[in-house]
Design a protein with these regions (language model features):
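Conserved core of the sugar-phosphate nucleotidyltransferase
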Residues: 125-203
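Active-site donor-binding loop signature of nucleotide-sugar glycosyltransferases
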Residues: 38, 81-83, 120, 168, ...
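Short, high-confidence coil segments that cap the C-terminus of an alpha-helix
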Residues: 55, 110-112, 140-143
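Short phosphate-binding loop-to-helix
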Residues: 51, 59, 65-135
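N-terminal glycine-rich phosphate-binding loop and ensuing alpha1 helix
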Residues: 3-62
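Short beta-strand segments
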Residues: 20, 117-119, 148-149
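Hydrophobic/aromatic residues located in beta-strands of well-ordered beta-sheets
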Residues: 17, 58-60, 115, 145-146, ...
Length: 204
């Protein structure tokens, strides 16, 4: 798909996607390449993310040679970043600068670009989830960033500190996030709490 000088097709901002992944996950080392139904988890994410129809560019972002070799084996782009990043979004930020400064996008970094992070451990993601975080940014340039949130209907997930919950106001603006079980009702968990968790898809 060709890019115009103004950005993406028909002059819209470019939509640039990154799938950050690393082998040294503290809770599950080697998780990105762990097989699910005989296919590495990361490949499930790639296949599903690629179904979104409006990418101007989509690539892996990693510091691991093993993941780069996997990407080369399936013919998928991969950007090598530093190994010092603690957060996936920091890796994505570096990867974007590398991609935007290369000939891959043409025209260099652009403040109008919409940068999307699809976490490499979300094998059940769907292309409409990408649209859910991208569409608000395309519609309103005053929105700085978006994150996908999912309702929690399971008490164990609500109590799990590995699950990041969020609280937002009525306008949908995130007020704060926590690994604690929030919001917390007087009688503990119930679906009426409308607790929500962060799903690993972000855009900014």
């Amino acid at each position: 798909m060709g890019l115009s000088e103004m950005g993406g097709p028909a002059g819209r901002p470019r939509v640039v996607g990154f799938i950050p992944a690393r082998m040294a996950a503290s809770r599950f080392p080697g998780k990105p390449l762990h097989p699910i139904l005989g296919v590495p988890m990361l490949e499930h994410v790639i296949r599903r993310a690629a179904m979104y129809e409006h990418w101007d560019y989509l690539t892996l972002a990693t510091c691991d040679g093993e993941i780069r070799a996997f990407a080369e084996g399936i013919g998928f782009p991969c950007v090598m970043t530093g190994d010092h990043h603690v957060r996936a979004l920091d890796r994505v930020a570096e990867a974007y600068e590398l991609v935007a400064s290369s000939d891959l996008l043409g025209g260099g970094p652009n403040d109008d670009d919409v940068v999307v992070c699809v976490q490499g451990d979300e094998p059940m993601m769907r292309p409409d989830m990408v649209d859910a975080v991208v569409a608000p940014l395309l519609a309103d340039t005053g929105i700085p960033a978006t994150v996908l949130a999912m309702h929690i209907v399971d008490e164990d997930l609500w109590r799990n500190p590995d699950t990041v919950k969020l609280i937002s106001n009525q306008a949908g603006e995130v007020l704060y996030t926590s690994r604690a079980p929030i919001p917390h009702g007087r009688e503990g968990f119930s679906e009426d709490l409308m607790a929500r968790r962060i799903y690993g898809i972000f855009a900014f």
